[in-house]
C-alpha cells in the first residue's frame, strides 16, 4: 500500500538525497526544460516537429503555461531532484467528480531506467488518493506502445483513442482506479 506523502526522500548513491517535492515558482523554468527535453525524444522517434505538431507538449510547453497551471488551474505540481538537479516532473489536476488528470509525467533521458518514473507515478497515485480521487486519467501518444505497456504494468487500463486534426498521431487514453 502506498502511503500519502507530501515529500518523499530516498537515500541515493554515495550519500546523495533524492527527493520528490512540490514545484515552487522559481522551479518553473527548469521544469519547462525537463518537460520539453523529455518529450522531445518521443517527437524524434515518431517524427513530430513544431510544424506538424505545434501543440505537442515538447513544443507547446512554456513558462506561461506552467504558471497558468499553477495559478489558474491550481494543479498540484511535483518534481524529482537529486542534489538540486531536477530530473523529473508531473502535474495533477484534481477535479470535483472524484477524478484527477495526470499530465506531463517526464523524466530526462539521461536519468531513465533508474526508477524515477515509477517513483513519480506512485507518488501521483498517493497524492491523488490524499485528495480523495477515485480515478486518475491521462493521455499518451497511442503509437508509443512502450509507454502504454509501462503504465499497464502498474495496473493502468487503456480506455480508448481519439484522432485529432492538429496532431500527426493518435491520442490514447488511460486510467487507473485508486
Residue ranges and their predicted role:
Residues 22-28, 33-109, 121-123, 127, ...:
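Acetyl-CoA-dependent GNAT
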Residues 85, 108-122, 131, 142-149, ...:
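Conserved glycine-rich acetyl-CoA-binding loop
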Residues 134-137, 141-148, 152-154, 161-178:
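C-terminal "cap" of GNAT-fold acetyltransferases
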Residues 2-29, 46:
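Conserved N-terminal entry element of GNAT/NAT acetyltransferase domains
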Amino acid at each position: 500500500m502506498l502511503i500519502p506523502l507530501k515529500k518523499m526522500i530516498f537515500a541515493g548513491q554515495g550519500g546523495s538525497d533524492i527527493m520528490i517535492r512540490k514545484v515552487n515558482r522559481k522551479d518553473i523554468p527548469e521544469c519547462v526544460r525537463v518537460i520539453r527535453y523529455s518529450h522531445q525524444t518521443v517527437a524524434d522517434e515518431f517524427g513530430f516537429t513544431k510544424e506538424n505538431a505545434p501543440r505537442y507538449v515538447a513544443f507547446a510547453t512554456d513558462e506561461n503555461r506552467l504558471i497558468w497551471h499553477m495559478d489558474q488551474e491550481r494543479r498540484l505540481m511535483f518534481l524529482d531532484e537529486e542534489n538540486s538537479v531536477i530530473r523529473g516532473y508531473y502535474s495533477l489536476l484534481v477535479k470535483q467528480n472524484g477524478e484527477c488528470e495526470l499530465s506531463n509525467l517526464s523524466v530526462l533521458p539521461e536519468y531513465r531506467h533508474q526508477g524515477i518514473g515509477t517513483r513519480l507515478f506512485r507518488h501521483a497515485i498517493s497524492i491523488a488518493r490524499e485528495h480523495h480521487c477515485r480515478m486518475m486519467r491521462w493521455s499518451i501518444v497511442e503509437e508509443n506502445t512502450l509507454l502504454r505497456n509501462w503504465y499497464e504494468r502498474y495496473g493502468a487500463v487503456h480506455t480508448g483513442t481519439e484522432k485529432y486534426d492538429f496532431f500527426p498521431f493518435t491520442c490514447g487514453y488511460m486510467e487507473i482506479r485508486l
